[in-house]
UniProtKB/Swiss-Prot annotation:
Species of the source: Campylobacter jejuni subsp. doylei (strain ATCC BAA-1458 / RM4099 / 269.97)
Gene Ontology molecular function terms on file: ATP binding; four-way junction DNA binding; four-way junction helicase activity
Domain III, as annotated region: 139-183
Annotated region (Flexible linker), positions in chain: 139
Name this polypeptide is given: Holliday junction branch migration complex subunit RuvA
Subcellular location: Cytoplasm
Keyword terms, alphabetized: Cytoplasm, DNA damage, DNA recombination, DNA repair, DNA-binding
Segments for region (Domain I): 1-64
Free-text note on domains in this protein's UniProt record: Has three domains with a flexible linker between the domains II and III and assumes an 'L' shape. Domain III is highly mobile and contacts RuvB.
Signal peptide coordinates: none
Amino acid sequence: MVVGIEGIITKKEPTFIIVKCASGLSYGIFISLFCSAKIQTQEKHEFFITQIIKEDSNKFYGFLDKDEQKMFEMLLKVNGVGANTAMAVCSSLDINSFYKALSLGDESVLKKVPGIGPKSAKRIIVELSDTRTKLENVSDDKSEALAALLTLGFKQEKIISVLASAQATGTSELIKEALKKLR
């Protein structure tokens, strides 16, 4: 099983890239639009991989952010949601919008995603509603950074928005990056 790939991006389409590794092997990886916006060709990146093997295919789905990968994998557990639909959700909703829709039971947010109708939106809300507490604990670093920035007087909505797009890892790095964007 492949769980990570690091290499130079040699080809980039909106939701598909080819990564050439140091070993000389190149891998085709499906990515979300959010991930695509953060990368360029000829850059070196490391991707968290979810590998899906079927009798007629072996596909890699790549993520720069472990939280987005967890969201993708949770969506795959929903009855009737496949990899394409899960990736459409990852491309349409940032992780905080997704969590908020789940916690509020807001089907209308999910219905805006291409390929998700009323029945699928309801099924996602129902089947993942009990996992909300797990989702809240996905990134302890982001939670700690949120708490620290709140004590500094910043608005929660702005903080969440900034942290959702943050590249840094670790609480202190997240806070530094957020402070630059919030000022």
